Amino acid sequence: MSDNEDNFDGDDFDDVEEDEGLDDLENAEEEGQVNVEILPSGERPQANQKRITTPYMTKYERARVLGTRALQIAMCAPVMVELEGETDPLLIAMKELKARKIPIIIRRYLPDGSYEDWGVDELIITD
């Protein structure tokens, strides 16, 4: 038992000031301003009709995809390519990327708040 447990009476939280930012959120709901659109469970977001971003995978996207996939493989996720003695998760992720078998979707946000979703298999990968 520590010394702090003996002196705790539960009333120590009374002197904490309430956050005034919460009042703004409550007032926004009362004014009828809704910033969130909830889709029904059967309805999916609209697919990209015309994409305006480049079809090339950037070096930052490549690094993020390889790191994320290597972490998944290290945590025993199923591997999407045939292994030929590889044990390093990063090397396996690189092999999956080269074979375009990584099951990850890249979401690119645009300045107007919209976004484009690209599958790894849709992007052009340069080395």
UniProtKB/Swiss-Prot annotation:
Residues 1-32 have a biased composition (Acidic residues). The modification Phosphoserine is found at S2. Residues 1-52 are annotated as: Disordered. GO terms for biological process: transcription by RNA polymerase I; transcription by RNA polymerase II; tRNA transcription by RNA polymerase III. GO terms for cellular component: nucleus; RNA polymerase I complex; RNA polymerase II, core complex; RNA polymerase III complex. It is found in: Nucleus; Nucleus, Nucleolus. Keywords: Acetylation, DNA-directed RNA polymerase, Nucleus, Phosphoprotein, Transcription. PROSITE patterns: RNA_POL_K_14KD. GO terms for molecular function: DNA binding; DNA-directed RNA polymerase activity. Component of the RNA polymerase I (Pol I), RNA polymerase II (Pol II) and RNA polymerase III (Pol III) complexes consisting of at least 13, 12 and 17 subunits, respectively. Pol I complex consists of a ten-subunit catalytic core composed of POLR1A/RPA1, POLR1B/RPA2, POLR1C/RPAC1, POLR1D/RPAC2, POLR1H/RPA12, POLR2E/RPABC1, POLR2F/RPABC2, POLR2H/RPABC3, POLR2K/RPABC4 and POLR2L/RPABC5; a mobile stalk subunit POLR1F/RPA43 protruding from the core and additional subunits homologous to general transcription factors POLR1E/RPA49 and POLR1G/RPA34. This is DNA-directed RNA polymerases I, II, and III subunit RPABC2. It comes from Bos taurus.
